[in-house]
Amino acid sequence: MSTWSSMLADLRKQAEIAKQQAKKGIDVTKNGLQYGVSQVKLQALAAGKSIQKYGNKLVLVIPKDYDVNTGNGFFDLAKAAEELGIQVKYIDRNDLEIAHKSLGVTDQFLGLTERGLTLFAPQLDKFLQQHSKISNVVGSSTGDTVNKLAKSQAIISGVQSVLGSVLAGINLNEAIISGGSELELAKAGVDLASELVGNIAKGTATIEAFSEQIQNFGKLVQNAKGLGGVGQQLQHISGSALSKTGLGLDIISSLLSGVTASFTLADKNASTSTKVAAGFELSNQVIGGITKAVSSYILAQRLAAGLSTTGPAAALIASSISLAISPLSFLRVADNFNRSKDIREFAERFKKLGYEGDKLLSDFYHEAGTIDASITTISTALSAIAAGTAAASAGALVGAPITLLVTGITGLISGILEFSKQPMLEHVASKLGTKIEEWERKYGKNYFENGYDARHKAFLEDSLSLLSSFNKQYETERAVLITQQRWDEYIGELAGVTGKGDKISSGKAYVDYFEEGKLLAKKPDDFNRVILDPKKGKIDISNSQTSTLLKFVTPLLTPGTESRKRTQTGKYEYVTKLDVNGINQWEVNGVKEKGAVYDFTNLIQHVHISSSVARGEEYREVRLVSRLGKGNDKVFLASGSAEIHAGDGHDVVYYDKTDTGLLMVDGTQATKQGDYTVTRELSGATQILREVVKNQKSSVGSRQETVEYRDNELAQSGNSNLKAKDNLYSVEEIIGSNHRDEFKGSKFRDIFHGADGDDLLNGNDGDDILYGDKGNDELRGDNGNDQLYGGEGNDKLFGGNGNNYLSGGDGDDELQVLGNGFNVLRGGKGNDKLYGGAGSDFLDGGEGDDYLAGGEGNDFYVYRSTSGNHTIYDQGKSSDSDTLYLSDLTFDRLLVEKVDNNLVFKPSDHNSNRGSLTIKDWFKTGHGYNHKLEQIVDKNGRKLTSDNLETHFNGTPKTNLLGYTAENQNESNLSSLKTELGKIISSAGNFGLAKQGNNNHSAALNNDVDKLISSASSFATAQMGGSGIGLLPSNNANSTILSGLARTA
């Protein structure tokens, strides 16, 4: 290993030792400074013992002819010295002058004489006059003597503490007697102590210089290897950001007048000569007079140890200093200023909206950044000095005491600065608090509430397009929109920084009116209280005279009042606890005369209380009680329990707009139509909107503030037993959730929608209307004339007794009716199975390969060219008269075949993609059943009877084209068909169709029949006023007519 490498390794080791010793010095200093004035005497005595161990006590020297009652309060200083056990010596001025000359003591208040360490009263008086801030602390010789005495003791004991660190390891008695290098070393230490005290008093004189220096840092380190990123960040700091005075930096000294040189040392690519030059510059400029004193002290130490003081030694010191400088500490400084800049840009908008709190927060980070930058940079420079001292003392027998000496000094300064930092930051925070209080006195309003007001104004500006669309979306003339301005990070942080967490609320609710998509002008403050009272939990829109939407645009916190208490939980820790006096009910009075829409989906009804492994998440529930008016209302419920008094009109309750849990709707105990009990399971993965207590943390230096607030979150309930229970009164229609719901109807008419999920709907008695919607649903009409709509999915529909209408919709459905009523069964898309009852049924398989069984009674089947491969199995009585209607086909284009016992119809065009129609067991006899269809009618009114087909197959037909076998076109066939079909449809659904007049044109009669068929598909819309689910229309106009030959019967 080269000599230079070995030297660097040794330097790194020495630097690390110096850092550890510096840390110890800081810790010792912190422990000493935290006691306050009451411990001043103990500190002074301890420091005196440290000095006395190696030399005489500290002596306050006062000329005999010096008037202690003049000047800046030396009467108090003399008394303080006596109280602290410091000797006060009055000597002739001539003796004092001789002592100065013989010992080379300059015109400073600290010195070395034959008596030992000496405080020179005149020089100290002059010093205090020059530094008014220190002088003001001491005060005059009149006034509060006890208080001034304590302050005087603080000054003197502080000087003793400094001297105790500086002179540790030096025997002053021997140094004074022997003179020489030891005496020079001691004098250098005293000089250093004087500079330390002096610099602390210099105030803000060089803050602007510091502003320029930190800019130079960025320029220098931007090009230094390994420090480019730091340099770029520092360049973002505005030069003017650090140039302001009056920021609470009164005790920051001018330690940084030449700190630029330290970054030159950090450039590992710089030449040795450059580092040497930078090292000398650092020695003379980095921290002003202190660095010069440290340099003198290092040189004196090296002379005392017989070590070299040449250029290479200086380079060695400079190299060690470079290792001690950590630019990473400046990243936090840059982050503070960048955060201030970001907040300031954000604040500009809200300042225009009447709130300046964001600017105040930006000011805090700006000023805190200045303080932090100053102290960080000073500490970095002091670390470099400690490392340089360690390098200078390397190899010396007195190295360890000397290193301890300097690290003690730097530790002392760092401790003073660190303990000064907190009061400075608190001073800045206090100024912000004062501004807030002044604003509140002027405007008579809570400052943070004003911040929420500004946030809401911005929300309206940003969301106007969305808010304006609600009138049209919900089809109402007026929209009453309630918006919760939730907890705001910046507003909360300002409350924490200023210690006013007990003055802030978790947010604020607002009410806005929109008509015809336009925002109405704001009314006075009492407007909100009329519509919404969040403290009492009351909402009232009963005065609205038009159709109205009540919508909670954002989640609304539960009703009640908040209170907060700020408590100190540690030396620098404060917690502002939140207490909520909650109301367990929302009460809503709706529009009296007009229809309205009530969207409660963003109403928070669950307050999170606690969590445990055994019981899961626990909640307090807030129940919704709503009293509506006479109009047709729509109510969208949230996840909590509700009591809905719907009033007159056709009212609908929706559970599908948010996750309301699995439903069990029960109307079996109802004594009035529209009364239901709804039980909801909110366990497992059910997502509920819940209110939780969160906390925001902010810091002011060492002070940590935690403020609790209410917020909302959408989360799994986490409670396997959590339920909600609704009581619905006078509700005509219920829309289910997106879970597997169960509906049990009443003895009255029920209208249920399963919505998403595999639902079970049972209408029980009454003329019910059931919709499965999406999912594989099961619908049971039971007794009564029911309408069942499967919707999407593979559904099962059971009509029960009565005249029923069943529509499978999409999917592979199964439809079945009982009894001898008139029933309509429509399969829709998919491969369906349709089973009629003992009465007259209409069976339309729709698209797909369907199976149709009419059962007993006079049944009516429909087949189209788009129907796929259908199978009809009619197991009726011999007296039955069943009909097959070929909606868009003619006999001329069909072939008929006997396949086993089945009658099969196929397109005459063998290449056609159309399906076939099989009438199962047509030719089967016995068992007492009739499997034939008595008549088959095509789109033009031509008819085939079962006898015609019997004759056809018993003879020797020239062709299987049915056109040769069917009767001639006859309009009376279509007229009769229309009558039969109309009877079934009108009985099953009571469609209220107008009677069709006679029409001699067969095409018109065909259209009338198709109108009867297609009218079924529009029944839901006609009956439900648009709220139902329509049927698939009949497809009767798009088939391709196949050519064929027709034979006259």
From Swiss-Prot:
Superkingdom, taxonomy of origin: Bacteria
Location, primary (coarse class): secreted
GO biological process, one term: killing of cells of another organism
UniProt record similarity statement: Belongs to the RTX prokaryotic toxin (TC 1.C.11) family.
Domains (record comment): The transmembrane domains are believed to be involved in pore formation in target cells. The Gly-rich region is probably involved in calcium binding, which is required for target cell-binding and cytolytic activity.
Functional summary from the UniProt entry: PaxA is associated with abortion cases in swine and septicemia in young piglets. Shows cohemolytic activity with the sphingomyelinase of S.aureus but is devoid of direct hemolytic activity.
Protein name, entry field: Exotoxin PaxA
Species, as recorded: Pasteurella aerogenes
